[in-house]
């Protein structure tokens, strides 16, 4: 797991602040849940946190309970399986797959695109900036913001 750095997270939410309140969010590779929980604290109407690791899900569920984050749903599922059953687009999507697993990013984008689930802003994080730009071009996403911290590159894009 590669948690999103605090500085990167702060930059991201400065970008997203005008759009978060009342929106639906998907944190597909939730890990620590930092991105989804931050969105929930900023007034997102619904945040879905998805991860395939049972221990992570148990910790996320406990944190959601402690925070009394009633606008959060924690889902134990593989990303692909979850996306096959998703019904409607998300206003904000966070795609921050585990470190050194770029294929997960590509397959998640493929499923999101094919399912018509990208309803607004999408945050992508990876080790290689070129990969992010190539994926955005392939899936017809316009990059609105970029940032880098160390070896981690991030973009905010929209359809």
Residue ranges and their predicted role:
Residues 1-159:
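Class I S-adenosyl-L-methionine-dependent methyltransferase catalytic core
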